[in-house]
Amino acid sequence: MVQSQGWVRRYFKAFCKGFFVAVPVAVTFLDRVACVARVEGASMQPSLNPGGSQSSDVVLLNHWKVRNFEVQRGDIVSLVSPKNPEQKIIKRVIALEGDIVKTMGHKNRYVKVPRGHIWVEGDHHGHSFDSNSFGPVSLGLLHAHATHILWPPKRWQKLESVLPPERLLVQSEEDCL
């Protein structure tokens, strides 16, 4: 009986040591390096959730790349919603600071993206709440860079950083006139 209590005590002690090492490492990894997220909604179709409401893609979000604001045109990023800080949204980077972009929708105007900001849009233009609605987004709202689709298994793939052909940038301010 005494032997069995000693074994239980050693096991419990080893478990506690492992737990108190593993939890901080896991939390740090998920906060600083990468995490996974489920994508909901139709705003990024056909790139994400091509099946509509029947399926939700799960993506790998890499925190490392956005840590130094290393974003490129075409990247799919996760960011804090400028209209609801409790919500994270996923959009494609269309323009960087200093770029001139033509807005989509009823306004059809030109906007020069200010310093420290980016222009983001959903791939499904008619169903996306994006920079066409709320304007340029501060780089400080960036959360992560979506790099891969992890689920469902048939959609496993690397997400490419490509600009949609209809969203080519305005080359100069003269092109706006």
Swiss-Prot record:
It holds the Pfam family Peptidase_S26. Its EC number is 3.4.21.-. It is found in: Mitochondrion inner membrane. InterPro entries: IMP2 (IPR037730), LexA/Signal_pep-like_sf (IPR036286), Pept_S26A_signal_pept_1 (IPR000223), Pept_S26A_signal_pept_1_CS (IPR019758), Peptidase_S26 (IPR019533). Keywords: Hydrolase, Membrane, Mitochondrion, Mitochondrion inner membrane, Protease, Transmembrane, Transmembrane helix. Its main location: mitochondrion. It comes from the Eukaryota. The keyword DNA repair does not apply. It is a single-pass membrane protein. GO terms for cellular component: mitochondrial inner membrane peptidase complex. The active site is at residues 43, 91. GO terms for molecular function: endopeptidase activity; serine-type endopeptidase activity. CDD domains: S26_SPase_I. One of its GO terms (biological process) is signal peptide processing. Heterodimer of 2 subunits, IMMPL1 and IMMPL2. Belongs to the peptidase S26 family. IMP2 subfamily. Catalyzes the removal of transit peptides required for the targeting of proteins from the mitochondrial matrix, across the inner membrane, into the inter-membrane space. Known to process the nuclear encoded protein DIABLO. This is Mitochondrial inner membrane protease subunit 2. The lineage of its organism: Eukaryota, Metazoa, Chordata, Craniata, Vertebrata.
